[in-house]
């Protein structure tokens, strides 16, 4: 590109500089006219080849949303002006898309914009929100865990299975669904579960409790290498491996979607104000462990967090209730 000519054109004459400047402007304009969807498809395919399927999905979802806003599929990167993106943000919020989801779309579009136009000194995303807002605490109480366990469900049914996986995750110190799905029998030894957390790569060891063994035995598959009947035996590689196929990822995401749907149905049966999900169980274990005075460093280690600050996000809202109770006790002592 002319960018390199302009940047490294030492010792040139003024006339040469003018020619290079003109050529640079022409190149910049040509880059801005790149068909957006053509570039998106290339980025999605590249991310899939690298095993970054979540990134690929984020790119695709954001591009589809922007295309719907623009109203045509032949949009160009020149359409991503600051004014247009501000309008897009208002459009998203007007369609009841939450701020964090809007921000996720903007970050995905910004990443693709930067890859397509890395050398252009333009910042169309400077006026839209790309951060993260505080979300409502997603956890249930200890009594609600006990209600869930006691809920009469048809043995062998999909709702019963979802409930059992949720409880297994809770018993296993908030073990993520992805790690449960890919859990192999070879990872169970010496009365413990040994696994590397998919998201962070942190090595975690969990003691196998009787309640966990009961659930494992309930769904035992003699001819499968997996502990639970979530993935088929055709899935040979760990989800954390770069060689994991798109087909394997699609199978996992389909199972996760079904799991969360079934948990939502169970939530209705229990009359819970906040629906159960694969995220709720981790927040719930962390919150209940903290209320039972488990050290924050141990909670962080159990969850596979690389930073304790991440764990504080899980339990931060509990501090508010602690302050409320402390103040209430103080007022009572003062006779107020």
Question: What is each stretch, according to the model?
Answer:
Residues 155-157, 251, 260-301:
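Short, basic (Lys/Arg/His-rich) helix/loop patches that form interaction surfaces
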Residues 8-10, 15, 19-94:
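Basic/aromatic-enriched alpha-helical hairpins
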Residues 209-273:
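Active-site/catalytic core of tyrosine-dependent DNA strand-transfer enzymes
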Residues 65, 94-126, 175:
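N-terminal DNA-binding recognition helix of tyrosine site-specific recombinases/integrases
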Residues 126-138, 142-177:
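Basic, Lys/Arg- and aromatic-enriched nucleic-acid-binding interface segment
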Residues 186-192, 273-274, 294-315:
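Short, polar N-cap/turn motifs at the start of nucleic acid-interacting alpha helices
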Residues 205-210, 219, 316-336:
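DNA/chromatin major-groove-contacting recognition/catalytic segments
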Residues 139, 197-201, 303-328:
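Catalytic-site neighborhood detector that most strongly recognizes the C-terminal catalytic loop/helix
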């Amino acid at each position: 590109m002319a960018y390199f000519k302009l940047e490294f054109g030492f010792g040139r004459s003024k006339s040469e500089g003018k020619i290079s400047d003109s050529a640079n402007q022409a190149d910049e304009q040509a880059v801005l006219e790149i068909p957006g969807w053509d570039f998106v498809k290339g980025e999605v395919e590249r991310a899939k080849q690298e095993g970054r399927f979540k990134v690929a999905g984020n790119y695709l979802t954001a591009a589809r949303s922007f295309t719907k806003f623009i109203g045509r599929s032949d949009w160009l990167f020149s359409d991503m002006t600051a004014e247009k993106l501000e309008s897009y943000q208002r459009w998203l919020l007007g369609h009841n898309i939450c701020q964090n989801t809007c921000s996720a779309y903007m970050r995905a579009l910004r990443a693709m914009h930067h890859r397509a136009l890395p050398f252009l000194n333009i910042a169309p995303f400077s006026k839209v929100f790309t951060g993260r807002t505080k979300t409502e605490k997603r956890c249930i109480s200890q009594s609600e865990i006990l209600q869930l366990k006691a809920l009469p469900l048809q043995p062998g049914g999909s709702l019963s299975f979802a409930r059992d996986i949720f409880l297994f995750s809770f018993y296993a110190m908030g073990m993520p669904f992805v790690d449960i799905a890919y859990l192999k029998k070879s990872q169970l030894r010496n009365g413990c579960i040994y696994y590397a957390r998919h998201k962070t790569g942190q090595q975690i060891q969990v003691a196998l409790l009787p309640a966990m063994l009961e659930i494992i035995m309930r769904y035992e598959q003699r001819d499968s290498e997996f502990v639970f009947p979530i993935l088929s035996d055709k899935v040979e590689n760990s989800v954390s491996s770069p060689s994991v196929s798109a087909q394997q990822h699609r199978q996992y995401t389909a199972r996760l979607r079904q799991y969360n749907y079934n948990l939502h149905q169970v939530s209705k049966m229990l009359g819970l104000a906040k629906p159960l999900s694969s995220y709720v169980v981790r927040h719930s274990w962390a919150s209940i462990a903290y209320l039972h005075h488990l050290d924050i460093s141990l909670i962080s280690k159990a969850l596979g967090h690389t930073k304790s600050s991440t764990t504080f996000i899980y339990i931060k809202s509990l501090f508010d209730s602690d302050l409320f109770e402390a103040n209430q006790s103080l007022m009572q002592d003062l006779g107020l």
